[in-house]
């Protein structure tokens, strides 16, 4: 059946292509009329099928009542296929030839037999096509024929020149429409680019605010963490903390370390805080604070910012030592040092200046716009920016020039030398570009030169911003160095210390002796470097205002005092540093929590 349907469809298409236009219109009218009749027939058959199905469902239950003549239900069929049930009370007098009152309803219009009805009933799987029925391919072919006829009528009664002029005019109109299409496309692209820039601006600002700290700023974060292994000389930048909190110990270690450690400051605290530090000596304080100070001594950046860091660290160590010394065992010395508040102010001002400089650099970098990309190529036809389309246009121009040259005198044509790219020496490109200096470049070389120029301009802007920030940082460091050079750092006057006082001080510092063999195994490299710093450090004294005394001098830190006592002083320094090393349990807890 499907095969017959396809053959019938092909035959109908062939017949329609051979029919004239008038016959087609008549056939269309006939087809519409036949389709109307077929639709009415189908509606009637559907109504009959519905009535028959309903009768089969209800009539067997009502057969006894029909014989009695009570409660008989019937169905009246209308032409539009609707069914209306009614009883005996609604029935009118019997119409002769249509239906009997005492019998069930009989449809007199159903004269066809069952095989005929089954054959004429439309099946959902079979499409019946008549010879006069049109199809969709026919409508499209009809439109093409009409357009072809219109195009032929356009050229009727015109000469060759008039036809060429008309073709040229139509070609110009086509190019204008193509140019308008390109313009609309570019306008749409520019609108989309503006929307994307507006949406991406906050994201770029949020991402640029997370900038890694500069090396100069990292130098201010030297006092942060215990080294993870003895061979570690430097400190990684991600493990450093700023000096804004002025505290060495993290809040996570508060439960494991003594409460007195929270008052130990890297930058020298005020005298009111030092009043709580005086009292009986506690060895745990000295041992636990040393790991947080050793990295600051071993970490020496190239800039001069390490000078105030070492000075504040040594002053903090001296304050810890002064808490172990009895007031009556040392003579007074009149040798004032710069106050801790001045040193803390200098360090704070330096850190604040570098932080402000870093923020200014970040702001400057955010203000520098990224290199603007060149206009994107439009990869659709027709487009003046598409190379393939330009190739076709050029080929069309060449063919047109050849056609024009055949009908004219060849001598009148001008000969033009072909262009050659001054950079890549090629002689073929969709677009030739001429620079201001007269050089002719191909499209590829011109695009690459534009990209290089934009990238170089952006790189120069970034370079200028970094150079300016570096110069400002150097000026700040020089100013701080000059201020540090003006302040006195040494005390010339030294008082004599008796032998008994030295022995008492020695016993005071060694309150918790430990075996030297076990302690020397755990000495980190930073402790050894601090030992060398103490051996080379000039003679320093603690101001008396910190300890409630006119002046206290730590003479055993200077190896030049008393040549005959040099070995004993070196031993004392080594023993003092060994006492400052924390127990293994505390160091492991600190490193584990960090």
Swiss-Prot record:
One of its GO terms (molecular function) is sequence-specific DNA binding. The modification Phosphoserine is found at residues 17, 123, 130, 135-136, 209, 334, 339, 341, 487. Residues 141-195, 450-483 form a coiled coil. Residues 62-143, 214-237 are annotated as: Disordered. One of its GO terms (cellular component) is nuclear speck. Residues 341-481 are annotated as: CR2. The modification Phosphothreonine is found at residue 121. One of its GO terms (biological process) is negative regulation of DNA-templated transcription. The keyword Transmembrane does not apply. Residues 130-140 have a biased composition (Low complexity). Pfam families: GATA, P66_CC. InterPro entries: P66 (IPR040386), P66_CC (IPR032346), Znf_GATA (IPR000679), Znf_NHR/GATA (IPR013088). Residues 74-89, 109-119 have a biased composition (Basic and acidic residues). Residues 166-191 are annotated as: CR1. It is found in: Nucleus speckle; Nucleus; Chromosome. Keywords: Chromosome, Coiled coil, Isopeptide bond, Metal-binding, Nucleus, Phosphoprotein, Repressor, Transcription, Transcription regulation, Ubl conjugation, Zinc, Zinc-finger. A zinc finger (GATA-type) spans 415-468. There is a cross-link at residues 33, 66, 98, 148, 200, 282, 354, 455, 468, 499 (Glycyl lysine isopeptide (Lys-Gly) (interchain with G-Cter in SUMO2)). Homooligomer. Component of the nucleosome remodeling and deacetylase (NuRD) repressor complex, composed of core proteins MTA1, MTA2, MTA3, RBBP4, RBBP7, HDAC1, HDAC2, MBD2, MBD3, and peripherally associated proteins CDK2AP1, CDK2AP2, GATAD2A, GATAD2B, CHD3, CHD4 and CHD5. The exact stoichiometry of the NuRD complex is unknown, and some subunits such as MBD2 and MBD3, GATAD2A and GATAD2B, and CHD3, CHD4 and CHD5 define mutually exclusive NuRD complexes. Interacts with MBD2; this is required for the enhancement of MBD2-mediated repression and for targeting to the chromatin. Interacts with MBD3. Both CR1 and CR2 regions are required for speckled nuclear localization. Transcriptional repressor. Acts as a component of the histone deacetylase NuRD complex which participates in the remodeling of chromatin. Enhances MBD2-mediated repression. Efficient repression requires the presence of GATAD2A. Targets MBD3 to discrete loci in the nucleus. May play a role in synapse development. This is Transcriptional repressor p66-beta. It comes from Mus musculus. The gene is Gatad2b.
């Amino acid at each position: 059946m499907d095969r017959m349907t396809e053959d019938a469809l092909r035959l109908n298409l062939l017949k329609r292509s051979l029919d004239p236009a008038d016959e087609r219109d008549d056939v269309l009218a006939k087809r519409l009329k036949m389709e109307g009749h077929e639709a009415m027939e189908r509606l009637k058959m559907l109504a009959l099928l519905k009535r028959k199905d309903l009768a089969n469902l209800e009539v067997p239950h009502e057969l006894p009542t029909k014989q009695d003549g009570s409660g008989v239900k019937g169905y009246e069929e209308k032409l539009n296929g609707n069914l209306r049930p009614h009883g005996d009370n609604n029935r009118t007098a019997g119409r002769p030839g249509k239906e009997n009152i005492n019998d069930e309803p009989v449809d007199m219009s159903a004269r066809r037999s069952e095989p005929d009805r089954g054959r004429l009933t439309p099946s959902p799987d079979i499409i019946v096509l008549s010879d006069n029925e049109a199809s969709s391919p026919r409508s499209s072919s009809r439109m093409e024929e009409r357009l072809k006829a219109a195009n032929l009528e356009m050229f009727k009664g015109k000469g060759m020149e008039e036809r060429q002029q008309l073709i040229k005019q139509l070609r110009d109109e086509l190019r204008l429409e193509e140019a308008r299409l390109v313009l609309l496309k570019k306008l749409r692209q520019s609108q989309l680019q503006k929307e994307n820039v507006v949406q991406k601006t906050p994201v770029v600002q949020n991402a640029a605010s997370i900038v890694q700290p500069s090396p100069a700023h990292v130098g201010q974060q030297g006092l942060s963490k215990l080294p993870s292994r003895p061979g570690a000389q430097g400190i990684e930048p991600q493990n450093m903390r700023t000096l804004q909190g002025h505290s060495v110990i993290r809040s996570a270690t508060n439960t494991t370390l003594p409460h007195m450690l929270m008052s130990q400051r890297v930058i020298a605290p005020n005298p009111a805080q030092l009043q709580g530090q005086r009292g009986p000596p506690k060895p745990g304080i000295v041992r636990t604070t040393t790991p947080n100070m050793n990295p600051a001594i071993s970490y020496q950046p190239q800039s001069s910012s390490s000078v105030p860091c070492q000075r504040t660290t040594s002053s903090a160590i001296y304050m810890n030592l002064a808490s172990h010394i009895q007031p009556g065992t040392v003579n007074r010395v009149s040798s004032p040092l710069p106050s801790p508040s001045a040193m803390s102010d200098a360090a704070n001002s330096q850190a604040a200046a570098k932080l402000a400089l870093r923020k200014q650099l970040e702001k400057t970098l955010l203000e520098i716009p990224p290199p603007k990309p060149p206009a994107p190529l439009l990869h659709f036809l027709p487009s003046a920016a598409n190379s393939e389309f330009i190739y076709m246009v050029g080929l069309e121009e060449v063919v047109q020039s050849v056609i024009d040259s055949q009908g004219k005198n060849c001598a009148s044509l001008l000969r033009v030398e072909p262009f050659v790219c001054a950079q890549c020496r090629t002689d073929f490109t969709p677009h030739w570009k001429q620079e201001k200096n007269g050089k002719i470049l191909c499209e590829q070389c011109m695009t690459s030169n534009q990209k290089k120029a934009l990238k170089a301009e952006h790189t120069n802007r970034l370079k200028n911003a970094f150079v300016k920030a570096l110069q400002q940082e150097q000026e700040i460091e020089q100013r701080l160095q000059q201020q540090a050079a003006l302040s006195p750092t040494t005390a010339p006057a030294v008082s004599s210390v008796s032998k008994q006082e030295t022995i008492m001080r020695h016993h005071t510092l060694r309150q918790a002796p430990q075996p030297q063999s076990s302690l020397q195994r755990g000495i980190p490299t930073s402790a050894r470097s601090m030992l060398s710093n103490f051996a080379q450090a000039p003679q320093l004294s603690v101001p008396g205002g910190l300890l409630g005394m006119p002046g206290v001098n730590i003479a055993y830190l200077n190896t030049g005092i008393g040549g005959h006592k040099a070995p004993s002083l070196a031993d004392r320094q080594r023993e003092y540093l060994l006492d400052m090393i924390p127990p293994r349990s505390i160091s492991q807890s600190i490193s584990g929590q960090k």
